[in-house]
Amino acid sequence: MKGLVLAGGTATRLFPLTIVTNKHLLPIYDRPMIYYPIATLAGMGIREVMVIVGGKSVGEVVELLADGEHFGLDLTYRYQRGALGIAHAIGLARDFVGDDAFCCVLGDNVLLGPDLADLAQKFETGPWGAGTLLYEVADPERFGVAELDAAGNVVAFEEKPAHPKSNLIPIGVYFLRPSAFDLVNQLVPSGRGELEITDLLNRYLPGNLFAPCYEGQWTDAGTVPSLLRAAELAEQQSQAGALPSPPERPVS
């Protein structure tokens, strides 16, 4: 399995913090934001990772992560021009992925809890075409929201609805196979001009989507309140001895 980290976008919800920098460089407790999704992929046993960059401070992102050796990873990079959506960014990785299953993690997602190695293996060896992790939140209107049937199965996803049909959202961890790239090519831009990940996931419904609930703690860090929440969660994990120290990176 290979990995993707999406680290583009304009991050207007974090202005003025992100006027002159990429949000994924902002600190969350004792390390840059982007270290968290990198650690999520490393915890699955993934070693080959592509970072999709865009927006400001691309050079600084590359300088920070370098070739990934200090994470035990082999990192490569691809540039996304403009805010064209998560599904569009995934489509840029077609040549990198080749014939392998892959996991895409959004660069502003912080997962603190058990690693995902077992879930990654279950997807890779299972029958599903795609997968994501569900998580219950208090403000689902900020996200894509899962609609469930009476048996608790996901039947649809809706992007940032005004009236959410549940409090369960697909967090920014997506398991996919190479066949996803053909589906990405069939998507049409949403009203905000993006290829939406919820539209891609809906192509696998009903019945072809792996969608377990995440049992750890999760937050995105795309707004000032959620950035603060992420730091608080990381501090709690650190004080409990559950947050490993950030990897040491040689400074030249």
What do the predicted segments below correspond to?
Residues 138, 142, 147, 151-153, ...:
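Ligand/cofactor pocket segment of small-molecule handling proteins
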Residues 66-72, 148, 202-205:
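Short, conserved catalytic or adaptor-binding loops enriched in Gly and charged residues
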